[in-house]
Amino acid sequence: MDPTTSFPKDKIKILLLENIHIAAIKQFEEQGFQVESISSSLPEDKIIEKIKDVHVLGLRSKTKVTEKILSEAKRLLAIGCFCIGTDQVDLIEAEKRGVPVFNSPFCNSRSVAELIICEIITLSRKLGDRSTEMHNKIWRKESANCHEIRGKTLGIIGYGHIGSQLSVLAEAMGMSVLYYDIARRLPLGNSKMCPDMKTLLENSNFVTLHVPDTKETVGLIGEEEINTMKKGSYLLNASRGKVVQIPHLANALRSGHLAGAAVDVYPEEPSANCKDWECELQKCPNTILTPHIGGSTEEAQEAIGLEVSDLIVQFINSGASAGSVNFPEIALPVSPSTHRILNIHNNKPGVLRDINNILSEFNVSAQVLSTRKQIGYIIADVDSEASKEIKKKISSLPNSIKTRVLY
């Protein structure tokens, strides 16, 4: 069933930043939504200019959605993060304003894990340096300090969806796997959990990072941690740019303490492709530098585009909030011959009583409610004749944030 919405679909505006996959654009357009797609991220002032009449904002990892932006987004219904992380969005402020944030936590896990396997082999065989030499007309065939990865130990810091999938691939290549995570996680295959990060660093030939961007992970790998690693070992980071202290990594590579590194993320990254990017790690020996491409495969981006756009479409069309990272997750089957009312309110004592006092005056055919931290979210199906009056009464409640007649 596709009921007529109280707000015409062709009036709903979607703003997509950072080159969101065409699959998402098509999915939105098939719903009749207006879609504007921009290939790069935008600075705060430019987003504020555009967001005043935008209903859905889509982005990847570079765009920052701040309190200031959200305060200007008067019509914003939802935010879609077409990536794993959501730390680029002020989730608390979005929650306060009744704006759910959706993401895709699993779709690019395989792509990132495959990249790490590729880089482990490339580093172990010094393929990057050999390729550069050949392009510079230098033929150097040697086996010194080039090794198989079979029998080597991979240490994984962060054993979530990427880390655990990587452990399976690494074992299939003949590697032993150690892992460390602040949460106790069951091992896959023959991987072994370390009691602390120091133990992992001391016993790994390759150390790879798969942690979120939090206060605790900023500068997680610094001089002390790098010095704890085995001499001749390798460090790989495809998680977040601020996790590794770049100057100390560069020193360890130039001194020979580390035999190589692969870095895909950086403390500061350009908002779009450019030709003048600089980093201390440039010219370091046996060092792979890639421009944040861990999840940049056609397969991953298409899957992410479809998943996040589908979650947003479901929210706009039915109010279902499944998959939101900052919102109560509820859904209600569509009921014929009714109007659907959505209400987002402050999660305070007495609010539900006030809402139910209003609803009790009318014929309510179905209702569902859930709360999360600061807010509560209710979906109610009511007689069509009463929907406007109910909306007016609920909207006037002091703790009501948003009330919408969906259809």
From Swiss-Prot:
This is D-3-phosphoglycerate dehydrogenase. SUPFAM superfamilies: ACT-like, Formate/glycerate dehydrogenase catalytic domain-like, NAD(P)-binding Rossmann-fold domains. Pfam families: 2-Hacid_dh (PF00389), 2-Hacid_dh_C (PF02826), ACT_AHAS_ss (PF22629). NAD(+) binds at H161, I162, D181, A238, S239, R240, D264, H292, I293, G294, G295. GO terms for biological process: L-serine biosynthetic process; serine family amino acid biosynthetic process. It is an enzyme of class 1 (oxidoreductase). Its EC number is 1.1.1.95, 1.1.1.399. GO terms for molecular function: NAD binding; phosphoglycerate dehydrogenase activity. The lineage of its organism: Eukaryota, Amoebozoa, Evosea, Eumycetozoa, Dictyostelia. The gene is serA. InterPro entries: ACT-like_dom_sf, ACT_dom, AHAS_small-like_ACT, D-iso_2-hydroxyacid_DH_PdxB, D-isomer_2_OHA_DH_cat_dom, D-isomer_DH_CS, D-isomer_DH_CS1, D-isomer_DH_NAD-bd. CDD domains: ACT_3PGDH (cd04901), PGDH_3 (cd12176). Keywords: Amino-acid biosynthesis, NAD, Oxidoreductase, Serine biosynthesis. GO terms for cellular component: phagocytic vesicle. Catalyzes the reversible oxidation of 3-phospho-D-glycerate to 3-phosphonooxypyruvate, the first step of the phosphorylated L-serine biosynthesis pathway. Also catalyzes the reversible oxidation of 2-hydroxyglutarate to 2-oxoglutarate. Belongs to the D-isomer specific 2-hydroxyacid dehydrogenase family. The keyword Chaperone does not apply. It catalyses: (2R)-3-phosphoglycerate + NAD(+) = 3-phosphooxypyruvate + NADH + H(+); (R)-2-hydroxyglutarate + NAD(+) = 2-oxoglutarate + NADH + H(+). Pathway: Amino-acid biosynthesis; L-serine biosynthesis; L-serine from 3-phospho-D-glycerate: step 1/3. The active site is at R240, E269, H292 (proton donor). Residues 340-407 form the ACT domain.
